[in-house]
Regions:
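Extracytoplasmic
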Residues: 156-177
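Active-site-adjacent loops and short helices of periplasmic peptidoglycan-processing enzymes
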Residues: 1-150, 159-160
Length: 177
């Protein structure tokens, strides 16, 4: 075990061995936090597991973009009417933390954000993320949208076991189709 001490300026941290899943060190990793954009880890996982054809087309709409923009959420930059693929949405959700990409994935996978969030919460429980509850797929603040770094670590360790998901989250730059 390694001690973080005062060298880490953040209030919460966790370092996990990616191969074994063992916690190397942590700082307040069991505290309840608002996961914000870390939500998109679960969004991408659930969409990836729910949509068989990652090259299936999706038409972005202004109705998806506008409310997210008005709420001040980060966007990937897709335009209303733009024809993209589910794969583009996965990268758009993961890399620039695009809320419109995340919301579009929810629609593509389940037809509504509500149904998709139910699936996210079910998946969290299956992974053993017992201190996590999602209220949306974008990471927008909500008092009941919570997790812990321990739970996020469980999720990340699972994601990194999948080569395609590891590639998505490990990519530096992506150009849409």
């Amino acid at each position: 075990t390694v001690t973080l001490g005062d060298t880490v300026s953040c209030s919460h941290a966790i370092l996990i061995n990616a191969e074994t899943g063992a916690v190397i060190t942590q700082k307040n990793a069991e505290d309840i936090i608002f996961p914000a954009s870390m939500t998109k880890l679960m969004t991408v996982l659930v969409a990836y597991e729910s949509i068989a054809d990652l090259d299936a087309p999706f038409r972005m709409t202004q109705e998806i973009i506008d409310p997210l923009y008005l709420d001040g959420l980060s966007l990937a930059g897709f335009a209303g009417g733009e024809e993209i693929t589910v794969r583009d949405l996965l990268y758009g959700s993961a890399l620039p933390s695009g809320a419109e990409a995340s919301y579009a994935l929810a629609i593509a996978a389940c037809g509504s954000e509500e149904a998709f969030v139910d699936r996210m919460n079910d998946r969290a429980l299956l992974l053993g993320m017992y201190d996590t509850h999602f209220e949306n797929c974008t990471g927008a603040h909500h008092n009941d949208h919570v997790s812990t770094l321990t739970d996020i670590g469980i999720l990340m360790a699972f994601i990194m076991q999948n080569d395609e998901l590891a590639e998505i989250f490990g990519t530096y730059q992506y150009t849409t189709t």
